[in-house]
Amino acid sequence: MAEWPILVMVLQEILSMRETEPKMDLLAIDDFDGELQQLIDWAIRMKNDDGFADSFKPLDGMSIGSIYEKPSTRTRVSFEVGVSKLGGQPLTLLANDIQLGKSESIADTAAVLSRFMDGITYRCFGHSDVQELAKHSSVPVINALSDMHHPCQAAADLMTISEKIDSVKGHVSWVGDGNNVLHDLMLACASLGIDIKYATPIGFEPDADIVSRAVTMASDLSLIHI
């Protein structure tokens, strides 16, 4: 999962716009709409500049709630460290700790948490669930993983590539199933002007609608299924 610097910058970017109308949510990587490269550059700076990291506290006095329907090690640690590094207070809510899906609906949960939290992250099964939470939440919502999208992971992958080579301009290849990470990598590569080639087994191709979105975003780039 992502190193904490990229999650720090995701949190800062989304929560800095919490007072805007409409509020900004991160449900898929293309929600950043042209700001992804700047976010990656700032995350690398925060990782390498201790002085900057120590003084950059935009979440001072804020509380961030993180709901986990799925077990997590790296995602949970990264979000908790990221919120703390930005001066905020992380609150982790495991599936068995709250009434979500039992006596309370997603809409009810969103309304309650919005009264106490400045932002919400949600690691869930169905992507429609995080969409529903964002719809009814009055504070920003970040998708910490759904069956369709994993935006923070894709951003972290591209951050790592940026650290290892001078420029991510060129080609990225993916071998494996067409899962949530591939979906956001395709959208991110389209946003950044990177050609991506992917090889997936028959029956495990990426979602056709997301492929179409990526192609529409980057008509002059190569998105090749091998």
Residue spans of the language-model regions?
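Positively charged, low-complexity intrinsically disordered leader regions
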Residues: 17-77, 81
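Active-site cofactor/substrate anionic-group-binding motifs, chiefly glycine-
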Residues: 63, 68-115
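Glycine-rich phosphate/diphosphate-binding loop of Rossmann-like nucleotide-binding domains
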Residues: 69-81, 165-222
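Anion-binding alpha/beta catalytic cores of soluble intermediary-metabolism enzymes, centered on
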Residues: 110-111, 118-188
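Conserved small/polar residues in nucleotide/adenosyl-binding loops
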Residues: 224-226
